[in-house]
């Protein structure tokens, strides 16, 4: 598995971060279930940690959850390893800074929701 920092040079110094510990649980999205209210569960418990999807050794996305809701910064990568998007979630909804990159790693758009 790759460490998030080794996958790209996504700048996160000004992002609103949820302070999950560096050893927080990291699982495949297939391990989670979701209810109609968009709350995510692991073994019938509200999930706190990271959901990460890989293609081979390359991370495709990393989504933060806190108490079953997307909360904090979520990152997505193009299949070539370049950053694709960074979205900030608060209580399950996109809220805060976002950035979008093209397949060559060039910043296409950034803003705040």
Where are these regions (language model features)?
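Glycine/tyrosine- and acidic-biased, solvent-exposed loop/turn segments at the edges of beta-strands
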Residues: 1-113
């Amino acid at each position: 598995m790759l460490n998030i920092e080794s996958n790209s040079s996504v700048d996160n110094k000004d992002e609103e971060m949820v302070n999950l510990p560096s050893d927080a649980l990291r699982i495949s999205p297939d391990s989670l279930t979701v209810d109609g209210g968009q709350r995510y569960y692991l073994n019938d418990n509200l999930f706190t940690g990271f959901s990460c999807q890989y293609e081979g050794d390359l991370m495709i996305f990393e989504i933060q959850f806190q108490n079953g809701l997307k909360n904090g910064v979520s990152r997505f990568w193009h299949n070539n390893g370049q950053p694709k998007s960074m979205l900030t979630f608060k209580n399950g909804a996109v809220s805060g800074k976002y950035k979008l990159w093209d397949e060559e790693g060039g910043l296409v758009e950034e803003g705040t929701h």
